[in-house]
Structure formats: structure tokens, C-alpha cells
């Protein structure tokens, strides 16, 4: 039996095949009509690594029953011959909201912030919606399904994009013929998470990314506790978390830093998240290699910027311009890094761009095999459907696309998409082409006829001499009909012909006057021009990334060197004081020798004649380099940590280096009495967030007093405390609860195994764990403070609970209570000369630092500001001006003293043998307003060099100019463009709510 070559395709309905056998029928005799389909002749790509040149696929009941080079044709089979075609598995989309309605946010404004959950019988936070199941609201969308099929998709995993814990998704095929019972492969396919709050509730917490991270962690702890019977009440959200824990977990992120953050949480709790990424992961591959995430990669490659206007072009950062150039390499770079990934279309404005952008990724180096895997087998594995979808094998769903060429070639088109054995025509079979220019003659009159697009929807143009005549055309079933007007547009002629020879058209019709007419049209030979040949598009040269991938980044990260500073004035901050014409030798990141040095074993020499060498500046109070600063959704946020949200790409880190800063503490803001945990970092420009963290540093936490925590200047008054008296009660209450929490765990841990088997473990509370660390002297307090009464209050509360406040920061009335601070053992990290910028600092004076210093308090000057942090050397000089502090002691205000407050003075803060080589070379006296930083060294490596910085200014200008020229060329070549938009940067301060 020969295969049948179908010219006209038809739809095969499987309703009789798949209808449940226990359903009654009242429309006739109940029969089983099991049709089989045999596809032959095509190149069949069984999976990304295996193909058959003349493959055959046998389909029955929506599934593949055989794939081979030779199959005996069943008697009742319908045979399709696709000779010359290519067949691939249909694609799988894992991150969609197909058919699931979105929730619109409330349009009514709230005067007061909502602090508590609305849902009863669920988790204490409304943004944990683990109990929601997307299949309950699913409604199949034929229009959207058609769009997705046209781009190659056969299966989508769909969920409602709402909340931090979003509940479950459903896995559904794009089969228009059947009902949801047949389409739905899994009603609970995966659970979904994000860092975004839901529109279903106005509950404020979490108000920051670090709050969202803490909440996710606490949910996991609570689910474990709940599963062990710890709760007295029923919590349907936690029950859903427990029920769904075996499902794949898909985590949506908004930027590259969030990808790593999500991966860290997953690794912490043994969850192998599938993380929906953002397209610029190539910028942090070293981090991702360590975390080993599974990724869903978008392909929304940016359009070139329209840089015709040079003033608008100035708004663009180098990173924005590089992203246009480098983004198409993202899939290749991720593949080369050995990271498992699948593609997603979810970030595209138009799904039609999906396959062209995949092809672009292949052009930029991604292998076709890896690209196909990311569309088929890998998403199938990730969603626990290996062998069922994503490949053409026995037992798998008959989901396949048929193309007219190799999938990743630019001109190849998807002609059909079969879903569960159901044929969907994407591109109808083309009609015989009659495109071309013809010389049309009738009644001794000549016309020019041009036909185009005849394979699909024909377009016709007729001109007489130079006059265009209004023309319409139809080309159906081999018959061509032309209708056109005369030059006056008042009379019409109508011609028709049956196409036999496309080079010579002959027919009859009616002339303008209504008389019968014969006509003919001979095709005009076109002269082929040499320059009309298609030229292969030359890809833009991809620029190398830097670390970080923006202005002033490094091509390779700095490493420690063997360096000898000679003939330099050395500010030791030790008993030796200031050494003239001295040397400092640095080896392996440490200071090896100070003073007169003879043998340096091949060190690189830096002549410091006329210059000054100091230890690096330490900023005890900073808010730079973080993605969020305040978690103000509760009156205590001890559960959050700045370490979660460090932003290593913040340009302020580089600017700090240019000001000689080598260590800084990024503090939580002052939105609540008990704030979050801080991060102590070294600004190693180009390193990852984890690599910047100060190793083995003591942990700190931010407390706050005054106007901010009682919301004096807020428009909402719904949160306790609202008075300074209430602030005192917050500290007392939380410390007491921490004591009781500690006692409960001690009692449980000290119990015998026999007793433990009969009782329930206490609930693990991240917030309480942090406060217990304070009670145990393992975590230290840095407290935002202004007014002496509150300063006294906190010291008294701390004494009552056996706690010592480590640092009062700001402390602008410290001069009033310096003696009490000395007795308590607390340091003061203050401003040099800030006063009268709000009511509670009306009594501030510029002599504050000097007075506290004279009373024996360890005093530091901090910045609390991204601008001031670059000139803390000048702030130190103000201690000499206001109060007559010696130059050496004043310099310690920004070096050794903050090191003492941070408990790292054994490693940094002075120039001493054995300490870390965190050094700054100044052009002049370090406290002079004329002095500039020439070099900044951290752990023996130069992270800032003035000469290099000056050279980079020119390099950046040249690179931006090249990218502008490339974008102009792309625009002239017809590429889409976008309007230049300046990338907004947020400057965080104590009161910034994010």
C-alpha cells in the first residue's frame, strides 16, 4: 500500500476515541472507532540528539505508538506523506498564565497601612497563597492557544502570577478540539513562588525584597513545625505547602541578583528551584556556577536604542548599551557554564518573536542541539514529564511540529503543529505561484500587470502607461479573477482564467463597456542584478564583559600582589605614630613589614615620595550597595538581613574606593525599633556579594529610636509604637519574649529522647533566634539615636536584660550623656557637623565627637550617605577644627575607631605587621581638601587606581561611541528601536522604605 499524499488537509476529531467509556450515549450506537495515523517521509528529530532521515511515526488515541524507519502500515491508518519536511517535538512553556485570570489591584486608596492578614484559617501573611490551585479558575483560551501553537508550543504550564507563594499550576495541552479533561495533563503540576506581593491583599509586610526572603524561609520552618503537630489551629496555607512539597518549584525573579537570591534560599532548604531568569545572567556566571540553579531563560532581547538625538543618547549607561550588544549570547554562555536551562516566552510582548529570537541565540553561538533541548526535553524533565512530552518516542503524546526546513534556519516556517495527535494548520499549503510582472493585452491595449504573494493572499497592481488603475484580485482553486477600473475610476473590467501555464495567462471576461473580451498576459523576463543577491547578515561583534559589567569594571579581577611602598609618610595608627620616609611591604594580602626594609624578594616598588599611606577608611554606617534598606512592615524586623540584598554592581562602591573606603557596614534603616541584621563588607569592585562579605566578622543588628520608629512624619498611624514610651515597651517585650523562647528550646533540647517523643518541639522563629543571639552576646547592637532621654532608656533596658549596646549611631546628643556611655561601654558613631535638619536634632553641636572622645568613648565619624562616604577623610579633619582633637586621633575616627566598634581592629584599622593590607595612597596629607586618593588596596589587591580611572573615562567614551554607531547602523538596516531611557538609581537613607 502506497502512502497517500494529501493535498487538502482535514481535521480529525478524536472525541469518539477518548470519550470516557463509562459515559452513556443517546445519539446512536456506541462504537469504538480507533483510527490510526501514519506520518511518513520527513526527517524526524526524535530528540535533540537522535533523528531519522526518512522517519515514520504511528499515532493512535493522541499518543505515539511507534517511531521507526520502517513501519508496517495498519489497514485502517490514515497516511500523511511529508517528504521534504522536518518534524520536531512541539515546544513546552513552563512559565505562563495561559487561561488563568489575573487579579487586579484595588483602585481604592488606603489612608492607613494594613499590617495584619485578612484571610482567616490561613497563614498569618496574606501573600502566602500556597492553597490556591490555578486549575480551579482555568478557562481555555483558543485565541491565545493559536498564537502559542504558531510559535511551536504544544504544552504550557500555567499559573496565576500572584503573591510570594502562589500555589500550584496546571499542565495543559493546546488542543482546540477536546475538553479540559482531555487537555489537562496535570491539575497540580508545580508550585510557584516569587518575591512579589499579591494584589489580593493590602497587607504591607513584606515591604522589601529582604522581607520577602525572610518570609519564605519562615514558611518552610513553619511548615515543618506544623507537619510535626506543633500548631493548635488549622492552617490551610501551610497544609498546602506540605501537600505540594514533592512538586517542582518554579521561582519567578525580576533581576539577575534575585536569581542568585532565590537559588540560595532553595539550596538552604534543599529545594531545587526552577528559576525564571531575566536575560543577563551572563554577567554573574561565576556565582551561578557555584549555586547550580535550574533556569528558565527569556529571549526578550532588547531592541537597539534610537540614538539619533545625541542628547537623548547621553541618558544611556554603558551597561544599558552593552546589554543590547551582549544579550543574545546569554543562552550560549549559560550552556557553556554547564547550567541546565529551558527557554520561556513569558517576557515577550509578542510570542511571534520567540522562535526568531531562539534562532538569534543559535547565531550567537548556542548549539542547535542545546537549543532544541531547551525547548523540549529539558522542560519535560523539569516538570516531571520525561518520556511523556518533549520527544517523539513510543508512549509519548503525539505533540509535534512540521517545518519546511531545519528548525533554526531563518527562512524555515512552522507549517503544522500536532497536539495529542490533533492536526493544527499553521501555514496553509501554498498555491501555485504566479508572482511576477506580466504584459497584459486586450482589445489592442497594453497594460502592466504585477502579481505578488500569490501563494497565499494574492496582491495585484495594473497600470496603463504611468496611471495606476484600481485593482482587486482573487486566486482560488487555480482560478485567477482580476477586476480593475479605467483611468476615470468610473468603469470596470473583469477578467478570469484557469492557471495552466504561469508564464502565459489566457482568458476572457468583460471590458469596460461590458462587451466580451479575450485577453492574454505574458510574463516579462526580469534582469537579475548582481547587487540584488542576498547577502549574509554579519553579526555585530560582541563586546567582552567586565566585572562588574558597567563603566570602570575590570576585564579580570584584581589579585593580591607583592608590593613595596617606599619613601612614603605612613600613618600607622599604632604606637609608632606617623613615620616619615618609611616603607610598607605587602605580601599575600597581608602587611609583612613596616619601617626600614632592605630585602623585599622581588616586590613591585611604588615610590611614595611626597605622598601619604594610611590604613583604609572604615564607614560604620552606610546604606549603599543594597537592593533594599528598610523592612517597615512590622515593629520588629530582626528576621531580615542586609546580607541577602547586597548589590555588588552599585557604582557607589567604586566611588567609595576613590575616597579611600575599604570596609563599610551596610545597616538596616530606622523604620522600626528593632531593625534587620547588617552586612559588613569590603568593597571589592567586580566581586560577587558573597565575596565582598567580611569573613568571620561579628554579626550586628540595627535598633532605632526617635521620630522614625514612632512614625512621626508618616501619613499612617496604624502601627505600634506611636510614642517614645511605646518604643521602650517594644524593646522590653521583645527581649522578654526572646528569653522565654530561649528557655523553651533549652527545656526541649535538654529533655531525654523518651520525653521528646511525647512532646512537640517549639516553633523555630528566625526573629526570636536573632534576638536570642543578642541576649547571648553573640550579636551586637548599632542603634540609631538622637535624644538623650531615649539613649538613657535603651541603656537601662539593655542593663536589665544583661545586654550591652555596642554602638549608638548618629548620637547627636551624645555629648550630654558621654559619661553614662563610657560606663555602659558603648561607642558613638556620629556625624561631624550635622545639626538642625529635623526637630529631634535641634540640640546637636559640631563639638559632639570631640566631647565624647574626651570622656573616653570610642568615637567614629560615619557617612549615612553615598556622597559623604567619598570624603570621610575631610569629615575626620573637622574633629581637629571643632574641639581640637589631634590629627592622629582625628584620623582614627574614620579608621581604627570604627574598626573597634565593628570588632575587626585585630585585622584592619591600622598599619601593622600581620594585619590585612587594606591601604590607601594619598597625593598629600590625608585630611587635606586638596588631597586625592591615588591607589586603594584591599587584601593586597588594587581595586582603585587613579591613572587607570582616568584612562577608563576615555575608554568608556570610545566604547559608547562604537555602540552608538552600531545602533545607528542597525536602525538604518531596518531593525526595531526603542527610545532611550535613563536607568533610575535609588539612593537609600535611614528612612527609605524599601
Region locations from a protein language model:
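Bacterial Sec-dependent N-terminal signal peptides
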Residues: 1-22
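Histidine-rich, glycine-flanked metal-binding segment
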Residues: 21-35, 44, 48-90, 105, ...
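His/Asp/Glu-enriched, well-ordered alpha-helical/loop segment
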Residues: 28, 41, 103, 111-123, ...
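Tryptophan-anchored aromatic micro-motifs
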Residues: 39-42, 429-450, 455-465, 471-473, ...
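C-terminal cap of metal-dependent C-N hydrolases
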Residues: 42, 397-430, 568, 916-956
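Beta-sheet ligand-binding and adhesion/scaffold domains
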Residues: 95, 441-443, 447-448, 479-549
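Polyanionic/metal-chelating signatures
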Residues: 140-280, 413, 419, 434, ...
Amino acid at each position: 500500500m502506497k502512502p497517500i499524499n494529501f493535498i487538502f488537509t482535514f481535521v480529525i476529531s478524536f472525541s469518539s476515541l477518548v470519550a470516557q467509556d463509562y459515559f452513556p450515549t443517546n445519539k446512536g450506537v456506541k462504537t469504538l472507532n480507533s483510527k490510526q495515523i501514519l506520518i511518513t517521509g520527513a526527517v524526524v528529530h526524535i530528540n535533540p540528539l537522535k533523528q531519522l532521515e526518512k522517519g515514520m511515526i504511528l499515532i493512535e488515541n493522541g499518543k505515539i505508538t511507534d517511531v521507526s524507519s520502517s513501519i508496517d502500515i495498519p489497514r485502517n491508518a490514515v497516511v500523511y506523506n511529508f517528504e521534504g519536511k522536518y518534524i520536531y517535538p512541539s515546544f513546552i512553556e513552563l512559565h505562563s498564565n495561559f487561561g488563568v485570570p489575573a487579579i487586579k489591584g484595588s483602585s481604592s486608596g488606603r489612608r492607613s497601612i494594613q499590617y495584619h492578614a485578612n484571610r482567616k484559617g490561613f497563614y498569618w501573611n496574606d501573600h502566602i497563597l500556597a492553597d490556591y490551585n490555578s486549575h480551579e479558575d482555568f478557562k481555555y483560551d483558543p485565541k491565545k492557544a493559536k498564537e502559542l501553537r504558531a510559535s511551536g508550543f504544544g504544552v504550557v504550564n500555567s499559573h496565576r502570577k500572584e503573591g510570594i507563594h502562589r500555589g500550584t499550576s496546571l499542565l495543559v495541552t493546546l488542543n482546540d478540539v477536546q475538553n479540559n479533561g482531555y487537555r489537562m495533563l496535570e491539575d497540580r503540576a508545580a508550585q510557584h513562588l516569587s518575591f512579589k506581593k499579591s494584589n489580593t491583599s493590602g497587607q504591607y509586610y513584606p515591604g522589601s525584597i529582604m522581607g520577602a526572603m525572610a518570609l519564605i524561609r519562615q514558611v518552610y520552618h513553619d511548615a515543618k513545625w506544623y507537619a510535626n503537630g506543633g500548631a493548635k489551629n488549622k492552617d490551610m496555607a501551610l497544609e498546602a505547602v506540605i501537600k505540594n512539597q514533592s512538586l517542582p518549584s518554579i521561582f519567578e525573579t525580576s533581576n539577575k541578583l534575585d536569581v542568585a537570591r532565590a537559588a540560595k534560599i532553595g539550596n538552604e532548604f534543599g529545594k531545587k528551584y526552577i528559576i525564571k531568569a531575566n536575560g543577563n545572567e551572563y554577567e554573574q556566571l561565576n556565582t551561578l556556577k557555584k549555586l547550580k540553579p535550574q533556569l528558565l531563560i527569556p529571549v526578550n532581547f532588547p531592541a537597539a536604542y534610537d540614538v539619533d538625538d545625541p542628547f537623548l543618547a547621553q541618558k544611556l549607561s554603558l551597561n544599558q548599551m552593552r546589554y543590547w550588544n551582549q544579550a543574545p549570547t546569554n543562552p550560549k554562555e549559560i550552556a557553556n557554564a554547564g547550567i541546565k536551562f529551558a527557554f520561556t516566552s513569558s517576557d515577550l510582548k509578542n510570542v511571534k518573536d520567540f522562535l526568531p529570537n531562539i534562532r538569534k541565540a543559535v547565531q550567537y553561538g548556542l548549539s542547535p542541539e542545546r537549543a532544541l533541548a531547551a525547548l523540549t526535553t529539558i522542560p519535560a524533565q523539569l516538570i516531571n514529564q520525561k518520556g511523556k512530552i518533549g520527544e517523539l518516542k513510543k508512549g509519548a503524546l503525539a505533540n509535534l511540529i512540521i517545518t519546511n526546513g531545519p528548525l533554526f534556519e531563518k527562512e524555515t516556517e512552522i507549517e503544522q503543529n500536532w497536539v495529542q495527535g490533533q492536526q493544527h494548520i499553521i501555514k496553509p499549503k501554498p498555491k501555485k505561484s504566479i508572482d511576477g510582472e506580466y504584459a497584459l493585452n486586450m482589445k489592442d491595449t497594453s497594460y502592466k500587470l504585477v502579481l505578488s504573494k500569490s501563494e497565499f493572499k494574492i496582491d495585484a497592481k495594473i497600470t496603463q502607461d504611468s496611471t495606476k488603475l484600481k485593482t482587486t484580485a482573487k486566486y482560488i482553486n487555480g482560478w485567477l479573477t482580476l477586476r480593475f477600473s479605467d483611468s476615470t475610476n468610473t468603469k470596470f473590467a473583469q477578467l478570469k482564467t484557469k492557471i495552466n501555464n504561469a508564464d502565459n495567462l489566457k482568458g476572457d471576461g468583460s471590458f469596460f463597456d461590458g462587451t466580451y473580451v479575450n485577453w492574454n498576459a505574458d510574463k516579462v523576463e526580469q534582469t537579475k542584478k548582481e547587487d540584488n543577491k542576498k547577502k549574509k547578515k554579519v553579526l555585530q561583534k560582541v563586546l567582552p564583559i567586565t566585572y562588574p559589567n558597567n563603566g570602570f569594571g575590570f576585564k579580570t579581577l584584581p589579585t593580591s600582589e607583592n608590593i613595596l611602598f617606599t619613601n612614603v609618610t605612613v600613618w600607622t595608627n599604632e604606637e609608632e605614630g606617623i613615620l616619615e620616609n618609611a616603607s610598607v611591604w605587602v605580601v599575600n594580602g597581608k602587611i609583612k613589614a613596616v619601617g626600614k626594609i632592605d630585602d623585599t624578594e622581588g616586590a613591585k616598588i611604588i615610590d611614595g615620595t611626597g605622598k601619604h599611606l594610611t590604613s583604609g577608611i572604615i564607614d560604620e554606617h552606610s546604606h549603599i550597595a543594597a537592593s533594599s534598606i528598610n523592612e517597615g512592615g512590622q515593629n520588629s524586623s530582626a528576621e531580615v538581613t542586609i546580607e541577602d540584598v547586597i548589590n555588588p554592581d552599585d557604582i557607589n562602591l567604586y566611588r567609595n574606593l576613590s575616597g579611600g573606603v575599604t570596609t563599610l557596614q551596610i545597616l538596616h534603616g530606622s523604620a522600626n525599633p528593632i531593625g534587620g541584621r547588617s552586612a559588613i563588607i569590603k568593597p571589592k569592585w567586580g566581586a560577587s556579594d558573597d565575596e565582598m562579605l567580611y569573613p568571620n566578622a561579628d554579626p550586628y543588628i540595627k535598633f532605632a529610636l526617635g521620630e522614625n520608629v514612632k512614625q512621626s512624619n508618616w501619613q499612617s498611624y496604624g502601627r505600634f509604637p506611636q510614642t517614645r514610651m511605646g518604643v521602650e515597651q517594644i524593646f522590653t517585650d521583645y527581649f522578654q519574649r526572646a528569653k522565654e523562647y530561649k528557655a523553651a528550646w533549652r527545656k526541649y533540647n535538654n529533655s531525654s529522647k523518651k520525653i521528646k517523643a511525647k512532646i512537640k518541639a517549639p516553633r523555630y522563629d528566625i526573629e526570636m533566634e536573632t534576638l536570642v543571639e543578642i541576649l547571648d552576646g553573640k550579636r551586637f547592637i548599632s542603634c540609631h539615636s538622637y535624644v538623650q532621654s531615649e539613649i538613657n532608656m535603651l541603656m537601662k533596658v539593655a542593663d536589665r536584660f544583661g545586654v550591652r549596646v555596642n554602638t549608638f549611631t548618629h548620637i547627636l546628643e551624645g555629648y550630654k550623656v558621654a559619661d553614662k556611655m563610657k560606663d555602659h561601654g558603648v561607642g558613638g558613631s556620629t556625624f561631624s557637623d550635622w545639626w538642625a535638619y529635623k526637630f529631634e536634632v535641634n540640640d546637636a553641636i559640631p563639638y559632639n565627637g570631640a566631647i565624647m572622645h574626651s570622656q573616653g568613648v570610642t568615637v567614629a565619624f560615619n557617612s549615612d550617605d553615598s556622597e559623604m562616604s567619598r570624603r570621610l577623610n575631610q569629615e575626620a579633619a573637622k574633629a581637629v577644627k571643632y574641639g581640637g582633637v589631634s590629627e592622629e586621633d582625628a584620623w582614627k575616627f574614620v579608621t581604627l575607631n570604627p574598626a573597634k566598634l565593628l570588632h575587626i581592629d585585630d585585622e584592619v584599622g591600622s598599619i601593622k605587621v600581620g594585619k590585612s593590607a587594606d591601604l590607601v595612597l594619598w597625593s598629600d596629607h590625608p585630611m587635606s581638601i586638596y588631597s586625592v586618593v591615588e591607589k586603594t588596596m584591599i587584601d593586597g589587591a588594587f581595586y582603585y587606581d587613579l591613572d587607570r580611572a582616568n584612562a577608563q573615562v576615555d575608554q568608556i567614551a570610545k566604547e559608547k561611541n562604537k555602540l552608538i554607531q552600531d545602533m545607528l547602523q542597525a536602525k538604518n538596516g531596518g531593525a526595531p528601536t526603542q527610545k532611550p531611557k535613563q536607568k533610575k538609581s535609588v539612593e537609600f537613607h535611614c528612612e527609605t522604605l524599601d
